[in-house]
Amino acid sequence: MDAYLHCLSHTPLVGFVDPEQAVLDEVNGVIADARRRISAFEPELVVLFAPDHYNGFFYDVMPPFCLGVGATAIGDFASAAGDLPVPTELAEACAHAVINSGIDLAVSYNMQVDHGFAQPLEFLLGGLDRVPVLPVFINGVAAPLPGFQRTRLLGEAMGRFLNTLNKRVLILGSGGLSHQPPVPELAKADAHLRDRLLGSGKQLPPDERERRQQRVINAARRFTEDQRSLHPLNPVWDNRFMSLLEQGRLAELDAIGNDELSAMAGKSTHEIKTWVAAFAALSAFGCWRSEGRYYRPIPEWIAGFGSLSATTEI
């Protein structure tokens, strides 16, 4: 059957710190166009590769990859909240297939996800519950991180399974591009923050969650005024990365180490591995072509903001 792919940057800062109206209208138009293409495709199943920001995954157990057999979005930063419609038996079959292919994919029957998962479902499909979804977490912030090669192999294994289903599959990648918002690091954490990163942060008191979110908002405002206050965005790298994906040259990314990527584009740029997994999964369906490429650095969102679609060819 056919597959359709869309990769999209996410940002929790939408509605909190926005760019000028002309830029906002431009981005909203890009998302609306992608949503129309997806609607015309009429997906029967969504596979969503996305990261977490210490809202569902912590250092008590931090897998490189995890498939949610059950998943709930927490609604951080006013994003959509609620259960994701995961088809249990299909998710279990997917996990077995990927593991049998040699990829050590963890599973969770109670996966907690944040805006990284919720935002693409909300923006591109109109809500969390529109289409059955297989949510796949890819660790993008908590060292040690998976590399490009292993992430690509995960995507290929997922794609081989998806191609056996006789369904119209929408493959989504969520995150990136270049950016480094104020995400905590275990090596630099004080005792309280360390406790949160080891797992107690999964159920934050409302006032603490509000303070945490306000820190990100304040950082975005500072970055808008002074782009030396955080790691700078890297449009050159972002566009090179998107071109490699469009040309199907995923394996060329394998040689880029995690430290090198962080230095080039920021420590949260590792979220782009969700895009790599998505394109690798699409490759299992045969020939494809890209469409709808968009890119703009948006300091207000602390992100090189990208959007890219691809469709299989008969």
Curated annotation (Swiss-Prot):
It is an enzyme of class 1 (oxidoreductase). Pathway: Aromatic compound metabolism; 3-phenylpropanoate degradation. Keywords: Aromatic hydrocarbons catabolism, Dioxygenase, Iron, Oxidoreductase. One of its GO terms (molecular function) is ferrous iron binding. Its cofactor is Fe(2+). InterPro entries: DHPP/DHXA_dioxygenase, Xdiol_dOase_suB. It catalyses: 3-(2,3-dihydroxyphenyl)propanoate + O2 = (2Z,4E)-2-hydroxy-6-oxonona-2,4-dienedioate + H(+); (2E)-3-(2,3-dihydroxyphenyl)prop-2-enoate + O2 = (2Z,4E,7E)-2-hydroxy-6-oxonona-2,4,7-trienedioate + H(+). Pfam families: LigB. The active site is at H115 (proton donor), H179 (proton acceptor). Its EC number is 1.13.11.16. GO terms for biological process: 3-phenylpropionate catabolic process. Homotetramer. Catalyzes the non-heme iron(II)-dependent oxidative cleavage of 2,3-dihydroxyphenylpropionic acid and 2,3-dihydroxicinnamic acid into 2-hydroxy-6-ketononadienedioate and 2-hydroxy-6-ketononatrienedioate, respectively. Belongs to the LigB/MhpB extradiol dioxygenase family. HAMAP family: MhpB. This is 2,3-dihydroxyphenylpropionate/2,3-dihydroxicinnamic acid 1,2-dioxygenase. It comes from Klebsiella pneumoniae (strain 342). The lineage of its organism: Bacteria, Pseudomonadati, Pseudomonadota, Gammaproteobacteria, Enterobacterales.
